[in-house]
């Protein structure tokens, strides 16, 4: 009986070791959760990283603000992009980066937060948006996934340089009222050369948070249309 008990204990120990090894292997193989993006409408984006960090960009439209933020990014000071008060900030600390900090001293800044690196890039360049008061952002997550958000803009001199980053996704405003329209945005997508090009900010804020008609006018190669309220997994293409 004692011998059988010892054999049973040894069998259980071996099973536990195999289980632990399997879990360790899964983690080593990339057990981290996928990065998820929620398009809230207009230019508002929520991203939950593989580490569980929550990033909001240009809070204003839609729903989905219940998750406490670790990072809030604002591209410029217009009221349809900077409703930071909509977002509950994480009690342990939340970083808020606005265009003012990202363009301090007239230089586009970069910020390394560990789970994501943020690079401010040129935006504006039209009568409604001064390049000295607007930025776009390139976000690169810890798994290598990279995403460009144009902010409110027309074509900028820096856009061709972004092609060298081999971006996974690029979001282009295309309302055609206060910024470039779908045709110009399509031309910008050809300059940036992201693997997936996404139309957003498809209408003036007084009209609607999302226009499928305008989104479909965006004719970029590898176009990806994300509707308001739609969530997707961000994937890094090597």
Report the location of each language-model feature.
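P-loop/Walker A phosphate-binding loop and immediately adjacent motor/lid segment at beta-alpha junctions
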Residues: 84-108, 193-203, 222-223
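Positively charged n-region of N-terminal signal peptides that target proteins for export
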Residues: 1-5
């Amino acid at each position: 009986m004692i011998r059988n008990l010892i054999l049973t204990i040894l069998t259980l120990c071996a099973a536990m070791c195999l289980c632990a090894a399997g879990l360790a292997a899964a983690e080593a193989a990339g057990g981290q959760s996928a990065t998820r993006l929620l398009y809230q409408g207009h230019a508002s984006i929520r991203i939950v990283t593989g580490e569980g960090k929550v990033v909001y960009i240009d809070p204003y439209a839609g729903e989905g603000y219940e998750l406490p933020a670790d990072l809030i990014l604002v591209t410029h000071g217009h009221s349809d992009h900077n409703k930071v008060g909509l977002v509950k900030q994480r009690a342990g600390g939340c970083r808020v980066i606005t265009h003012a900090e990202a363009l301090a001293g007239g230089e586009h800044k970069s910020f390394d937060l560990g789970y994501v690196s943020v690079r401010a890039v040129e935006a504006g360049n039209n009568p409604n948006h001064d390049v000295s008061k607007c930025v776009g952002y390139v976000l690169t997550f810890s798994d290598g996934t990279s995403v460009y958000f144009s902010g409110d803009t027309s074509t900028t001199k820096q856009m061709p340089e972004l092609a060298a980053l081999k971006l996974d996704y690029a979001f282009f405003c295309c309302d055609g009222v206060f910024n470039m329209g779908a045709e110009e945005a399509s031309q910008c997508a050809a300059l940036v050369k992201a693997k997936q090009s996404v139309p957003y900010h498809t209408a003036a804020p007084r009209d609607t948070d999302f226009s499928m008609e305008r989104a479909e006018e965006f004719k970029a190669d590898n176009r990806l249309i994300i509707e308001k309220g739609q969530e997707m997994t961000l994937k890094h293409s090597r």
